[in-house]
Amino acid sequence: LLSFDPDKNGGVASAVLDNNGYPGVKLTRTVKLDRNKFIDRFEAQSEEEHTYDYVLALSDKPELGDGFVDARLEGKSPAYEFIKGVKSKIYKNGIVTFKAGTTKFEIKNTYKTPIEVFWAEAPDIMYGSSEKDTHTIKSYMLVVRTKGKNLSISSVIILGKKR
């Protein structure tokens, strides 16, 4: 953790992981909360080519529009094997905007190169305070994938009111 600066409307936190998460990759993340707006800036730097996935777990189905095709989401993590019914679409301009429930999302590859967006229904999210009080809710995975030596993703998430 580099910094944590809370304020009356939220605050800003910043962290760096240099070579410890993935050999040869420096990861930097800065998140800011300003009332109902959440801004996430995620960067990766390397001397080698990588496949980078920016992953969101959503409790509401994303409203992404047309043009998605059946796909297979492959990755190094065994968690990818649990995600079924995957759809994908390439966004040549590197920007995807959508809603999920009452929340609005704008995710940009700030290098303005294409991104591939995958989404699928994922295993349900379980929550509760005890074994007898456990509930599940539907869960959706959204993965923004890009390839290259470096990654720079900027997300703006505007939280809507609960229904």
Show the residue positions of the predicted features.
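CBM-like, beta-strand-rich accessory domains located in the C-terminal region of large
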Residues: 1-163
